[in-house]
């Protein structure tokens, strides 16, 4: 009886496959004249073996000969594949992560590959040449918590299959050719990292649905084609953010005072957009910020003295170049002398490297649509610096543009 049991266990972990010297690939799988018996450590590995071999046959470029290691039954020794015990089963062995970062492999699609690893926790394939769309069946990968497909050739809409995957904490789809809008739910998901920069996303950013809470630490939307205003709910609810990169899009309107709620941020970059109006005084609530970039917008008014005064100890860079600011007070001049503040190419009288008088005049005579509605909101702040009243702070930030 014991011998029969051992034989049965052996057969569960084996699979009949053709000899590598004569194997052929067909739509029905692997066939060949000569067959060999491969013994696998676990049935889970036997199941993914043909998946790997099928994907291997689709690879058209392998400059580092990675796939030459994808032979035999020892899948755990294949380069790029890593095995571990699946959750809730410490005696089993499975492919827990796939890491092809920097392999420069080329394949037309990952359809039928990533979605076949039932126990996959990490999928990292940045800096390859994979194309197509992200398979919708990845929604079935219940253990997946890191997805990095950056720097490839993926196309189509935002991979909506990731929406609702409660285990996902890290999504990186940078440097691809995704387009369209992003689903509102993704901003309210339990993510720590969301990198979607350097794609072709358009439309305006959605407001965060539900209770408007989020746990995102790093949010990068840079180098897309997002337009419309900065959603107040995103700024208001993302106190956990440490890096906010919205640069080089087409955002319009004024900077909401809710930006002052990004109290955990060390880097905020909204340069290279079409934002207008004055800088909100709530910026002085950003106690941890080290780098602030608003360069290349349509901002005007005075550089707020309160911001320069209260953030001077932590600020490493405050870039306001290529705007239409008209005044810099003594505290801000101190940051200029330290090389922290950059106000080049503005409209500040008697300052070097400013716009021409004609260029400034043309900007300030434009219709009042360039002024923000509810201007008093820009003097609103909610932080521990409440001893500075809105009335006294108005001395820091004159709202009226000078005569051209």
From Swiss-Prot:
Start and stop residues of the LRR repeats: 117-141, 142-165, 167-188, 189-212, 214-237, 239-262, 263-286, 287-310, 312-338, 340-359
Gene Ontology terms: cellular component: extracellular region
Protein localization: Secreted
Annotated InterPro entries: Leu-rich_rpt, LRR_dom_sf, LRR_extensin-like_regulator
Major localization listed first in the record, in broad terms: secreted
Signal peptide range in chain numbering: 1-16
Keywords: Leucine-rich repeat, Repeat, Secreted, Signal
Name of this protein: Uncharacterized protein At4g06744
Organismal lineage: Eukaryota, Viridiplantae, Streptophyta, Embryophyta, Tracheophyta
């Amino acid at each position: 009886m014991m011998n029969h049991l051992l034989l049965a266990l052996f057969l569960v972990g084996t699979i009949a496959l053709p000899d590598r010297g004569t194997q052929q690939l067909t739509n029905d799988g692997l066939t060949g004249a000569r067959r060999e018996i491969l013994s696998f450590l676990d049935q889970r590995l036997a199941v993914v073996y043909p998946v790997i071999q099928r994907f291997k046959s689709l690879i058209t470029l392998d400059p580092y000969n990675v796939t030459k290691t994808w032979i035999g039954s020892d899948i755990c020794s294949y380069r790029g594949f890593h095995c571990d015990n699946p959750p809730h089963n410490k005696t089993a062995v499975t492919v827990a992560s796939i890491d092809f970062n920097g392999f420069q492999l080329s394949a037309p699609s990952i359809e039928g590959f990533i979605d076949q690893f039932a126990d996959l926790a990490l999928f990292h394939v940045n800096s390859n040449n994979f194309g197509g769309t992200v398979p919708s069946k990845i929604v079935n990968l219940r253990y997946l918590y890191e997805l990095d497909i950056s720097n490839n050739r993926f196309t189509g809409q935002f991979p909506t299959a990731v929406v609702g995957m409660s285990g996902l904490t890290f999504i990186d789809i940078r440097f691809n050719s995704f387009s369209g809008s992003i689903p509102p739910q993704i901003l309210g998901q339990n993510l720590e990292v969301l990198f979607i920069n350097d794609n072709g996303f358009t439309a305006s950013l959605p407001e965060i649905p539900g209770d408007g809470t989020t746990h995102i630490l790093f949010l990068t939307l840079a180098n897309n084609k997002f337009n419309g205003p900065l959603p107040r709910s995103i700024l208001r609810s993302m106190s956990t953010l440490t890096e906010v990169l919205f640069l080089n899009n087409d955002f319009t309107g004024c900077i909401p005072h809710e930006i002052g709620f990004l109290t955990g941020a060390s880097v905020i970059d909204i340069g290279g957009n079409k934002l207008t109006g004055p800088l909100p005084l709530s910026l002085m609530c950003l106690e941890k910020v080290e780098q602030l970039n608003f360069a290349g917008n349509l901002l005007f008014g005075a550089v707020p003295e309160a911001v320069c005064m209260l953030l001077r100890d932590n600020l490493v860079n405050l870039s306001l170049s290529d705007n239409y600011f008209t005044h810099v007070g003594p505290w801000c001049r101190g940051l200029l002398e330290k090389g922290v503040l950059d106000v080049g190419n503005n409209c500040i009288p008697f300052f070097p490297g400013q716009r021409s008088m004609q260029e400034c005049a043309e900007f300030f005579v434009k219709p009042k649509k360039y002024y923000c509605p509810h201007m008093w909101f820009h003097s609103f702040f909610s932080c521990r610096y409440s001893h500075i009243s809105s009335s006294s702070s108005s001395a820091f930030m004159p709202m009226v543009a000078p005569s051209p």
